[in-house]
């Protein structure tokens, strides 16, 4: 194991670095649509795997974009990643896509980071705080498949709705904007 970076720092750097790489390949405009999404999935997966091979060679690895290696089940430490959550959103130039990186030790999540690269943000388990913003008081729902009942529920609760793409973007939306104040206990 490389002692150059703590697990927390490595988790955060992987989420940030993956996001920067993905923004870079999208920004040059050589690929579009499905080809861009597939290239993004592949490149992000390969880069994360290589970084973990170098810095945490004895750890297990589980990724949405790679074949499962059952050997991870024998490991005390397992990295769980979704290198590009929201491939369709990424490929079409939307901002609601994410990079997920987590370390689980002996079955317990110990470090996690969710990068929202187009928003210039990495949410880290090492840095929890209350945030408010333009989506406060809104229910996050699927941009692609919003439930028919969502508007009714939002109206009954006196809330609005916010259609969001990737699961990571929805999760961060919930963490950031469901609590109107720190005293509500969600992010205190």
PLM feature spans:
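Short helices/loops that flank or line small-molecule/ion binding pockets
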Residues: 169-176
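N-terminal low-complexity segments that are often proline-rich with Ser/Thr-Pro
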Residues: 185-188
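Conserved small/polar residues in nucleotide/adenosyl-binding loops
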Residues: 177-182
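N-terminal subdomain of lithium-sensitive/metallo-dependent phosphomonoesterases centered on the IMPase/IPPase/PAP
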Residues: 1-84, 152-155
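DPxDG-like acidic metal-binding loop motif
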Residues: 72-126
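Residue-level signal for inorganic ion chemistry
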Residues: 22, 52, 87, 116, ...
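A short secondary-structure junction signal
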Residues: 124-126, 149-154
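Short loop->beta-strand "edge-of-pocket" segments that line small-molecule binding or catalytic clefts
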Residues: 130-148, 156-165
């Amino acid at each position: 194991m490389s002692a150059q970076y703590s697990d927390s720092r490595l988790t955060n750097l992987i989420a940030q670095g993956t996001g920067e790489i993905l923004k870079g390949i999208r920004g040059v405009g050589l690929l579009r649509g499905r080809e861009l999404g597939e290239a993004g999935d592949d490149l992000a997966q390969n880069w994360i795997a290589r970084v973990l091979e170098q810095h945490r060679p004895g750890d297990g690895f589980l990724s949405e974009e790679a074949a499962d290696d059952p050997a991870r089940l024998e490991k005390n430490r397992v990295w769980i990643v979704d290198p590009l959550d929201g491939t369709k959103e990424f490929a079409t130039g939307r901002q609601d896509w994410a990079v997920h990186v987590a370390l689980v030790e002996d079955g317990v999540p110990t470090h996690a980071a969710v990068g929202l690269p187009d928003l210039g943000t990495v949410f880290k388990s090492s840095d929890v705080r209350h945030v408010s913003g333009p989506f406060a008081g809104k229910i996050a729902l699927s941009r692609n498949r919003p439930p028919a009942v969502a508007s009714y529920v939002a109206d009954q609760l006196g809330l609005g709705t916010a259609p969001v793409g990737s699961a990571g973007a929805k999760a961060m939306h919930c963490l950031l904007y469901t609590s109107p104040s720190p005293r509500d206990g969600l992010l205190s």
